[in-house]
Amino acid sequence: MAALKSWLSRSVTSFFRYRQCLCVPVVANFKKRCFSELIRPWHKTVTIGFGVTLCAVPIAQKSEPHSLSSEALMRRAVSLVTDSTSTFLSQTTYALIEAITEYTKAVYTLTSLYRQYTSLLGKMNSEEEDEVWQVIIGARAEMTSKHQEYLKLETTWMTAVGLSEMAAEAAYQTGADQASITARNHIQLVKLQVEEVHQLSRKAETKLAEAQIEELRQKTQEEGEERAESEQEAYLRED
C-alpha cells in the first residue's frame, strides 16, 4: 500500500512536470508575441516622435556680437538702400537713353524731309508742295512728341540721381565705404552715358536748324527771283 501511494505520488508529480514543460514554452511564446505586438508600435511612435522632436528643436547659432551691433545693422541697411537706388537709377537711365535716341531719330527724319523739300523748291506745283508740307508737319509733330516724352523721363532720371547721391552720402556717413564708392561710381557712369546721347541729340538739332535755315534762304531767294521776274514783265509791258 505504501508502495502504491509512492508510485501514485511520483506519477502525479511527473504528470504536472510534463504539463509545466508543455505549457511554459507556449505561455512564454505567447507573452513574448504579445509583448512584441505591443512594443512594435511603441518603437514606431518613439522613432517618429524623436524625429519630430529633433526637427522642432532649433539649432542654437553662435552669437555674433559684431554683426548684431547698431552700426553693423545700419551699414547693412544702407547697403540695401544703395542697391535699390542703383537699380532704380539703372532702369531710368536705360529708359531715358532710349527716349533720347528715339527723339534724335525723329530729328534726323525731319531734317531729311526739309532738305528734300529745299531741293525741290521751284520744281513742284502747289498741290505737290502741299503734300510735302503735310509730311513735314507730321514729322514735326512726331519729333515734338518724342521730345516731350524724353523731357518727362529726364525729370524722373534726375530724381533717381538725387536718391542715389543721398544713399551714397548715407553710406559714407555710416561707414559703409564700399557701398558709397560703388554708388558714386555708378552715378558718374550713368551721367556720362546720358551726356553722350545728349551730345548726339544736340548734333541732330544743329543739323535740323541748318536745314531749316537753308530752306528759308532758298525760299526767300526763289520768292525774290519770282518778284524780280514779275517786276521785269510788268516793266516790259509798260514799255
Curated annotation (Swiss-Prot):
Residues 217-239 are annotated as: Disordered. Signal peptide: none annotated. Ubiquitously expressed with highest expression in testis. Expression is also high in heart, liver, kidney, spleen, prostate and ovary. Low in brain, lung, thymus and peripheral blood leukocytes. Isoform 3 is ubiquitously expressed. Changing A56M: Fails to inhibit BIRC6 activity. Fails to inhibit digestion of BIRC6 by CASP3, CASP7 or HTRA2 mutant 'A-306'. SUPFAM superfamilies: Smac/diablo (SSF46984). InterPro entries: Smac/DIABLO-like_sf (IPR009062), Smac_DIABLO (IPR015142). It is found in: Mitochondrion; Cytoplasm, Cytosol. The record marks C55, A56 as: Cleavage. Keywords: Apoptosis, Cytoplasm, Deafness, Disease variant, Mitochondrion, Non-syndromic deafness, Transit peptide, Ubl conjugation. Transmembrane segments: none annotated. Its main location: mitochondrion. One of its GO terms (biological process) is neuron apoptotic process. Residues 1-21 form a transit peptide. One of its GO terms (cellular component) is mitochondrial intermembrane space. Ubiquitinated by BIRC7/livin. Ubiquitinated by BIRC6. The keyword Transit peptide applies. A motif (IAP-binding) lies at residues 56-60. Gene3D superfamilies: 1.20.58.70. The keyword Transit peptide applies. Promotes apoptosis by activating caspases in the cytochrome c/Apaf-1/caspase-9 pathway. Acts by opposing the inhibitory activity of inhibitor of apoptosis proteins (IAP). Inhibits the activity of BIRC6/BRUCE by inhibiting its binding to caspases. Belongs to the Smac/DIABLO protein family. The mature N-terminus mediates interaction with XIAP/BIRC4. Homodimer. Interacts with BIRC2/c-IAP1 (via BIR3 domain). Interacts with BIRC6/BRUCE; inhibits BIRC6 activity. Interacts with BIRC7/livin. Interacts with XIAP/BIRC4 (via BIR3 domain). Interacts with the monomeric and dimeric form of BIRC5/survivin. Interacts with AREL1 (via HECT domain); in the cytoplasm following induction of apoptosis. Interacts with BEX3. It is linked to Deafness, autosomal dominant, 64: A form of non-syndromic sensorineural hearing loss. Sensorineural deafness results from damage to the neural receptors of the inner ear, the nerve pathways to the brain, or the area of the brain that receives sound information. This is Diablo IAP-binding mitochondrial protein. The lineage of its organism: Eukaryota, Metazoa, Chordata, Craniata, Vertebrata.
